Amino acid sequence: MNKELLEKCKQKLLEEKAKILERYLEKEETQQRLGEESKEPRDWEDIGQMTYTEELLDNLSNVEIATLREIDYALEKIEKGTYGICERCGEEIPEPRLCAIPWTRYCAKCAEEVERESGTYMPSYGVDMYNPENIQVEREDIGEA
């Protein structure tokens, strides 16, 4: 993989990570404002404070958490020099796929296989199913005008 592509992917990873963390901060600020508006003085408020990481994990969705982990893993792979190599077949992941999903671990073929094995595969039905010629309308389907 050339240095230019590697730097481009690294930048995309860092930008996506920043976006997710920004969404977290926005959520946190909103929760703080709402909490301050309805706050009653309590002695136990300071007890049991969470660490920043625990708060982060509590306030992010599961998808955002998984994406953050994948981004961090991809950044580690860049540092180790193993970024852009499919973890299943060992082939280089094509540039268009890396640009679209810079935290991907697999080439498209292997990703589909992994999804099938894990039960998360959703087939693409293609454009043809939306072709107006393929749509049949029965007379009873049409409401009276």
Curated annotation (Swiss-Prot):
Which InterPro entries does the entry mention? DnaK_N, Znf_DskA_TraR, Znf_DskA_TraR_CS
Record-linked Pfam families: zf-dskA_traR (PF01258)
ZnF segments: dksA C4-type: 86-110
Q: Enumerate the PROSITE patterns for this protein.
A: ZF_DKSA_1, ZF_DKSA_2
GO MF term (any one): zinc ion binding
Q: Which keywords, in A-to-Z order, does the entry hold?
A: Metal-binding, Zinc, Zinc-finger
Hey, what's the signal peptide range on this chain? none
- PANTHER family referenced in this protein's UniProt entry, alphabetically: GENERAL STRESS PROTEIN 16O, RNA POLYMERASE-BINDING TRANSCRIPTION FACTOR DKSA-RELATED
Protein name in the entry:
Uncharacterized protein aq_250
Q: Which organism is it from?
A: Aquifex aeolicus (strain VF5)
